[in-house]
């Protein structure tokens, strides 16, 4: 018989005999889930029994009390009594009570552990009973093979002992290491603890049977430990095993893609010292000091600078030796170090990507021609120049500009600077000939000048050498010192900032600061941005103080705007270290400095997905009184979320419907930045109504640009709205009634969506998951086009070629093939535009009214008759015949303006009739032919790609190396980028890909006739 009340059992708790109380507690423990309301009225008695240490089953009393409090919803008390129950609390029990208490226990333990580690002096010691339950829980996970759960608890509770156990005890150690690395980089916000975990991962990678050098290197980049990286590379290059040498090259390529200039410089310096003959190494990169020779110096200057270098090198035994005196092992080591230096200095990567972009250029000039014909306003002229630069970014093809020199010459004043700087985007990465390319625009010693072209040329040099400026910095620095004109100084500052990005060089900073202190608005704006670029992520207290104090003093809004960006760049990726600066900037009375606070949050927490940062930005987005600050706050959300783009639409969806147009614009840009290149449908769904229906034109401008960022390199198969948006851009541009602002956005969008000859994507993180430093900086500077159009060019820093480039041991591209296991159309280039529209317009323009034509003919005929004095009858008849013919011709004109076409149609109809009459046999033949075509038409399910291959980001997952080739990759090809292959066949079997010349494959060159055959000229 089932119980209807617990009153009888509860009454036993008042009995004096302990055995009866124990009996009562055991019964209550069994029925507590059903009768907890009744038991709760006597909870005090149970609590007293628990606290009575002489009572034999005081732990059981704690267990009952814990369950009662759990049902009452008082989880903290429930946890306290569960801890008091000791071993009676079974962590392995599978019920709601146990799971809830364990969850609360872990949360409580995490809070105590974190507080104890971060504030050991103030925090109380962690409760041992809590730790006991957590330990049992971890052990349960390990016993049940729930290694990921154990690893998660270990990271949350900061237990490095458990972290190691969870990885090493698992069945798949490499898989667990990869999972641990991803979790560490995406979820751990605290910089100090993240570094501790990464150090642990490095030791685990090193202890594997075959050390995982690639991932070790990724961890060491985050740890900012260049010497450990250099040591690893040195060990690999000393090895006589070819695989180890090739692995060193692969690591060097990954390093160049992921690390800062300063980090690479330190690795290079350390590597040079380990070489058998350091002085024999090429000096392509010298960090923190004077840079190597640039193209502007003469041969004599070069030899002098080489002598200086050798003088600076300490005179030791290595200097006296020559290459010939080395043994075979040392020669190999020297050669390997030379190759590493060429890779780490960026020469090889930049040259290979340039080759790929030139070779694969599929930019559609017809798009630009259509835009050029449609625009009539100077702003749109500038936009078209910028769009052309984006479209040909890195391809070195300036075909469109050469074809339209008269049109280009319309650019005046600052538009001329923008146009000249666009050459820097087109020739991005074409570093060897950069000075020769820009020679005709660069400042010259003699002759007066407006300075717009010269400033643009210096800015262009910065764009060509962005984040890789060792060979051009000295030239730019000298030009900036010599500049007499504010326009030249403006371009010089921007160029120097881009080339010296992240070098933290004091001499560059001082020169830029000197230009800032001239109190010239135009120069000061560029200097402010450039100072931040040079001191990128340095958290240099002196630099921040200089910039903030000058920002508070200056009266020039332009200078303030430049400094707002510059200040934020100094805190790049500094996480919580930037909080004090953010707090002071956010509370400033000047709205431009408050805006700087928003940019600082964006830069400090870029890519972290930090909830704290997003909360702060959302608060400002809805509360600040200044529209610019609100717009910046919403835009900044995009920078925080670019590693988890799928979260961005839900965060900004309400802001996208705000009454404030600046907030709507910010929401559009945030979507563009966070979801760049993803083709995310949720993001496009938010942008589409903005583009079509928003009443404010600058919101439409932002939405158009953002849509192109998201749809870059997407086809209708991967994102159904792709063609719709391409057509929309063309419609907005050609519509005479559209506002200039919307047109500007549409023109830029056309350039962005086809960037890099349709071979580049927008990406704020590298393939290996690191923040793409120059891309984030370029994107932030691009958002400033709102105030200053020339800054739009910096978006080119975020364009990443989507290629897989295979290299052999000589760092050359061998002829080899990859297989893409997907239909070719899924990742194909968009179809080129046809030139139909312009032809139709010409025909319509030449239409003549038939009545007018007939009237003219009659008048002419009458005049001729009047002029003739004597007329024969024969001639009269002839004239009558002619008149009849003319009348017939007139009638013909009435019916159709294009008689030739009509004749052709009629002929076709007649032919069709003849064919129909030919009988059923021909029809049967036709049907057979159709069937054959239909059978041939099914698209192949895969395609073969030649090295170097254009492989889209979403295509990488279906990419593989074709079997049967004599090349084996040193890392997974699905990561993409530059991959070193080991050649397993004979050395003489290798066929190499022929390099192509820069300036791109010109259309004119293709049409040129062949030269005549050789012949002898004999005089008579």
From Swiss-Prot:
Keyword Phosphoprotein part of the UniProt annotation: yes
The ranges of region (Disordered) come to: 279-322, 855-950, 999-1020
Q: GO molecular function terms here?
A: enzyme regulator activity; zinc ion binding
Q: What segments bear the compositional bias annotation Polar residues?
A: 281-293
Presence of keyword Transferase: no
Q: Where are the PC repeats?
A: 418-452, 456-489, 491-525, 526-560, 562-595, 596-631, 632-664, 666-701, 702-742, 745-777
Modification type Phosphoserine: residues: 298, 303, 305
List the biased-composition ranges (Acidic residues). 1003-1020
Q: Name one GO biological process term.
A: proteasome-mediated ubiquitin-dependent protein catabolic process
| Function noted in UniProt | Acts as a regulatory subunit of the 26S proteasome which is involved in the ATP-dependent degradation of ubiquitinated proteins.
**Similarity comment text for this entry:** Belongs to the proteasome subunit S1 family.
What this protein is called in its record is 26S proteasome non-ATPase regulatory subunit 1
Its organism's taxonomic lineage begins at: Eukaryota, Metazoa, Ecdysozoa, Arthropoda, Hexapoda
